[in-house]
UniProtKB/Swiss-Prot annotation:
Family of this protein: Belongs to the PNP synthase family.
Site (Transition state stabilizer): E147
MF (Gene Ontology): pyridoxine 5'-phosphate synthase activity
Entry keyword annotation includes Metal-binding: no
Chain's gene name: pdxJ
Binding site for 1-deoxy-D-xylulose 5-phosphate: D8, H9, R43, H48, T98
Lineage start: Bacteria, Pseudomonadati, Campylobacterota, Epsilonproteobacteria, Campylobacterales
Key words, A-Z: Cytoplasm, Pyridoxine biosynthesis, Transferase
Protein name: Pyridoxine 5'-phosphate synthase
Annotated active site: H41, E68, H210
Function: Catalyzes the complicated ring closure reaction between the two acyclic compounds 1-deoxy-D-xylulose-5-phosphate (DXP) and 3-amino-2-oxopropyl phosphate (1-amino-acetone-3-phosphate or AAP) to form pyridoxine 5'-phosphate (PNP) and inorganic phosphate.
Length: 257
């Protein structure tokens, strides 16, 4: 299984002080050496990664670059100019802390944007909710890749197997008894398995990501149809204590098949 290392949260740390440290390019070199792919989300408001980050990483890193971006003309034109290995189209809201759900596949610009990217040999992935309907739509749209949103799975795992319910970060919708949470967790995991199988059957390459960490990744690794995981925040958080190289290698060991 391949690991895409999302380095957005290195940029978060840099932007917190609006200085040039930590150096995102240095992080990209480490991610390229020990991971399989660099994933970077250039948001419309540029709150984390900047255009020059993407350009530098594409110019100087040998690793495949997976650009996450919304259906935004300015950023799509940047992608067409710089030509990352892949573009993963994601939904985006200005007020969100992180990507909250899968892409709306009925967006009028979506098909046209996919074709433009593919015409310059950029692979296209769609970040989607794990639903059979969205997988079928992705195949109709002729995307090469889908990335299944694992956020709900991750939230359920956290509610079941951590102390988050006793903290300010608890989710109100998951304020339920353990038996109910366990049932929902098993249902969501089974749904991810069915979606991965469906995607593969339709000829799509299947990735997964969002909220995955060192505690919850193992059940996802067992879904053989998923060929790649894109993981960022948990790796960067671990790197504060272990260093980025060790944090990546630790995750690589966990996802080894």
């Amino acid at each position: 299984m391949l690991l895409g290392v999302n380095i957005d949260h290195i940029a978060v740390l840099r932007q917190a002080r609006m200085v040039n440290d930590p150096d995102l390019l240095e992080a990209a070199f480490i991610a390229a050496k020990y991971g399989d792919q660099i994933t970077l989300h250039v948001r419309e408001d540029r709150r984390h990664a900047q255009d020059f980050d993407l350009e530098n990483i594409i110019n100087f890193c040998k690793s495949p670059i997976n650009l996450e971006c919304a259906l935004n003309d300015e950023i799509l034109n940047l992608a067409l100019k710089l030509k990352p290995h892949r573009v993963t189209l994601v939904p985006e809201k200005r007020e969100e802390l992180t990507t909250e759900g899968g892409l709306c596949l009925n967006h009028v610009k979506l098909k046209q944007s996919i074709e433009k990217l593919q015409n310059v040999n950029i692979e296209v992935s769609l970040f989607i909710n794990p639903s059979l309907e969205d997988i079928e739509k992705s195949q109709i749209l002729k995307a090469e890749f889908i990335e299944l949103h694992t956020g709900h799975y991750a939230n359920l795992h956290n509610a079941l197997f951590s102390n988050i319910s006793h903290t300010a970060f608890a989710l109100k919708e998951l304020d339920q008894d353990k038996k109910t949470l366990q049932t929902q967790f098993e249902k969501e995991l089974q749904n991810l398995k069915l979606c991965a199988k469906k995607g593969t059957k339709l000829g799509l390459k299947v990735a997964a990501g969002h909220g995955l960490n060192y505690k919850n990744v193992k059940p996802i690794v067992k879904i053989k149809e998923i060929c790649e995981l894109n993981i960022g925040q948990s790796i960067v958080a671990r790197s504060v204590f272990t260093g980025l190289q060790n944090a990546i290698l630790e995750m690589k060991e966990l996802i080894k098949r």
